[in-house]
From Swiss-Prot:
<dbReference type="InterPro" id="IPR027417">
    <property type="entry name" value="P-loop_NTPase"/>
</dbReference>
<dbReference type="InterPro" id="IPR027368">
    <property type="entry name" value="MnmE_dom2"/>
</dbReference>
<feature type="binding site">
    <location>
        <position position="438"/>
    </location>
    <ligand>
        <name>(6S)-5-formyl-5,6,7,8-tetrahydrofolate</name>
    </ligand>
</feature>
<dbReference type="GO" id="GO:0005525">
    <property type="term" value="F:GTP binding"/>
</dbReference>
<feature type="binding site">
    <location>
        <position position="118"/>
    </location>
    <ligand>
        <name>(6S)-5-formyl-5,6,7,8-tetrahydrofolate</name>
    </ligand>
</feature>
<feature type="domain" description="TrmE-type G">
    <location>
        <begin position="215"/>
        <end position="362"/>
    </location>
</feature>
<dbReference type="InterPro" id="IPR004520">
    <property type="entry name" value="GTPase_MnmE"/>
</dbReference>
<dbReference type="GO" id="GO:0030488">
    <property type="term" value="P:tRNA methylation"/>
</dbReference>
<dbReference type="InterPro" id="IPR027266">
    <property type="entry name" value="TrmE/GcvT_dom1"/>
</dbReference>
<feature type="binding site">
    <location>
        <position position="249"/>
    </location>
    <ligand>
        <name>K(+)</name>
    </ligand>
</feature>
<dbReference type="InterPro" id="IPR006073">
    <property type="entry name" value="GTP-bd"/>
</dbReference>
<keyword id="KW-0479">Metal-binding</keyword>
<feature type="binding site">
    <location>
        <position position="229"/>
    </location>
    <ligand>
        <name>Mg(2+)</name>
    </ligand>
</feature>
<dbReference type="InterPro" id="IPR005225">
    <property type="entry name" value="Small_GTP-bd"/>
</dbReference>
<feature type="binding site">
    <location>
        <position position="250"/>
    </location>
    <ligand>
        <name>Mg(2+)</name>
    </ligand>
</feature>
<keyword id="KW-0460">Magnesium</keyword>
<dbReference type="Pfam" id="PF10396">
    <property type="entry name" value="TrmE_N"/>
</dbReference>
C-alpha cells in the first residue's frame, strides 16, 4: 500500500496516556518531522518533544519506530504515546494529517497485516475476538486462534489434500500405465478417508466454538406464574424481569447475559405456556416455543404444588434438560426424581441449580484437542470441502477427472478459510468489525 494512515489506538476521551499509530511508506519521514532526528532505534521507546510544522511543541511523549517488514502491519510503522488530553490528541492527529497521512478505516492496520502476509484470516478473526472477549473462555479460544491453531489445522489439511491430488493427476496424465490404478487406490484413497474423518470430527463439536463466542443459550419455560421471572432475577442477582402475581406478565423474551465457569451464558425468560387469551400473548407463546427449540439447554419451571403443570412440562423437555420444582416455600406436593426443588423467592435451593448449570456449560464448552470452529463461515467452508472430498473419494476408480475437479474445489474451500484465495466480500466483513486504530 502506498498511503500512510494514522489512528488513535486507545479509546477517545480524556485519559492518562493516548497511543497514536502510524503505518505506511511515509511513516519514517513523518516520525522524523514530528519527533526530530536521530530516528529512534527500532522497537525502543524514546522520549521526545513532538513539534508541529511550525516548530511549536505539542507535547512530550514516547515514540517508537517499527521498520517494515518487522512490524505488525509489515510496513514501516510508528507509535506516539502522548498525554491523553483531547487537545493534545487533536494537535498530533492534525500534524500527521498536515504531513500527508490519512485517517485509517476500521480494521485497516489489521487488514494491512493480512495483505502483507503477517497473519492469515483466521488469525485476524482471533484478534478481533480477543479484543471483544469478556470471559475467560472467550479469551482462551481467541488467543489460541490468534496464535494460529486453526491456520495450522487447515493448512495441514490442504497440504495432505494436495499430496493426494498428485496421485489423482498421475492417473489422469498417465492412463496407460498398468500400475497406476493400484497406486492411485493405495496413495489417495486412505489419505482422503483420513481427511474426511478429521473434518467430520471438526464439525461434530456441538458448535462449541460458536457458543463460546456468542454465548451458551439457556431458556426458561413453563406455565404462567410458575416463577420463571423470579428464577431469572435470582440467577442474574438483579431485577431483570418484572414479577407480579398476575398470570401472563411476561409477554416478550427477557435476556440476561451471565458468566458461568468462565464462559458466556445467555438466559432467556419467556412467556408462560398456555392457551393464549389474546394475539399479543399468542405471539409471546410462539416466540417462547421457538426460542426453546433452538436453545442449548431448557430449564422447565413448574409450581411444585401442581401435577398438571408438571405433566405438560415434562412433555416439552428432552434428555439433558433440567426440571425445577419452584415455590418450595409454599409447600411441596409433587415429586420428581432428578428435579431441582427450590424457592426462587427466597433463594433456597438455587445454589445447587446454578452449580449444575455451570457444570453443564463447562462440560459442553471445555477446551479440546482439536481447535474449535468459531464462526459460521468456518463451518460452511469445511462442510463444502467435506462434500467435495466425499465425491472425490467415491469417483477415484471410475472418474479420476471428476475426482480431480472435486479435490480442487475442496482445496479452494480450505483456502477461503485462511484467505489464500480472493474472498473480497469476506475480507470486508471481517475487517469492518474492528475498531478504528486496529
Amino acid at each position: 500500500m502506498n498511503t500512510t494512515v494514522y489512528a488513535l489506538a486507545t479509546p477517545a476521551g480524556r485519559s492518562g496516556v493516548a497511543v497514536i499509530r502510524l503505518s505506511g511508506g511515509g511513516a519514517g519521514g513523518m516520525l522524523d518531522a514530528l519527533a526530530g532526528l536521530p530516528r529512534p532505534q527500532p522497537r525502543m521507546a524514546t522520549l521526545r518533544a513532538l513539534r508541529d510544522s511550525g516548530g511549536s511543541v505539542m507535547d512530550r511523549g514516547l515514540v517508537l519506530w517499527f521498520p517494515g517488514p518487522g512490524s505488525f502491519t509489515g510496513e514501516d510503522s510508528a507509535e506516539f504515546h502522548v498525554h491523553g488530553g483531547p487537545a493534545v490528541i487533536d494537535a498530533v492527529l492534525s500534524a500527521l494529517d498536515e504531513a500527508g497521512a490519512h485517517p485509517a478505516e476500521a480494521g485497516e492496520f489489521t487488514r494491512r497485516a493480512f495483505e502483507n502476509e503477517k497473519i492469515d484470516l483466521t488469525e485476524a478473526e482471533g484478534l478481533a475476538d480477543l479484543i471483544d472477549a469478556e470471559t475467560e473462555g472467550q479469551r482462551v479460544q481467541a488467543l489460541s486462534q490468534m496464535s494460529g491453531s486453526l491456520r495450522r489445522l487447515y493448512d495441514g489439511w490442504r497440504d495432505a489434500l494436495i499430496t493426494a491430488m498428485a496421485s489423482i493427476e498421475g492417473e489422469i496424465d498417465f492412463p496407460d500405465e498398468a500400475d497406476v490404478p493400484d497406486a492411485l487406490s493405495h496413495a489417495a484413497y486412505e489419505p482422503l478417508s483420513e481427511l474426511i474423518g478429521s473434518m467430520f470430527e471438526h464439525l461434530d463439536d456441538g458448535r462449541r466454538g460458536e457458543r463460546i463466542r456468542i454465548g451458551f443459550s439457556i431458556v426458561l419455560i413453563g406455565a404462567p406464574n410458575a416463577g420463571k421471572s423470579s428464577l431469572l432475577n435470582c440467577l442474574a442477582r438483579r431485577d431483570a424481569a418484572i414479577v407480579t402475581d398476575i398470570p401472563g406478565t411476561t409477554r416478550d423474551i427477557v435476556e440476561v447475559q451471565l458468566t458461568l465457569g468462565g464462559f458466556p451464558v445467555v438466559i432467556s425468560d419467556t412467556a408462560g405456556l398456555r392457551e393464549a387469551v389474546d394475539a399479543i400473548e399468542a405471539e409471546g407463546v410462539r416466540r417462547a416455543l421457538d426460542r426453546a427449540e433452538h436453545a442449548d439447554l431448557r430449564i422447565g419451571v413448574a409450581d411444585a404444588r401442581s401435577d398438571e403443570e408438571l405433566v405438560d412440562l415434562e412433555g416439552r423437555l428432552t434428555d439433558g434438560d433440567l426440571l425445577v420444582l419452584n415455590k418450595l416455600d409454599l409447600g411441596l406436593v409433587s415429586e420428581r426424581d432428578g428435579a431441582y426443588r427450590l424457592s426462587a423467592k427466597s433463594g433456597d435451593g438455587v445454589e445447587a441449580l446454578e452449580a449444575r448449570i455451570e457444570q453443564i456449560v463447562r462440560d459442553r464448552l471445555s477446551v479440546r484437542e482439536m481447535p474449535a470452529l468459531s464462526r459460521v463461515r468456518h463451518r460452511r467452508a469445511v462442510e463444502t470441502a467435506l462434500e467435495a472430498l466425499s465425491r472425490c473419494r467415491d469417483q477415484l476408480a471410475d472418474a479420476p477427472e471428476l475426482a480431480g475437479e472435486d479435490a480442487r474445489l475442496a482445496v479452494r474451500a480450505l483456502e477461503s478459510l485462511t484467505g489464500r484465495v480472493d474472498v473480497e466480500d469476506i475480507l470486508d466483513r471481517v475487517f469492518s468489525q474492528f475498531c478504528i486504530g486496529k
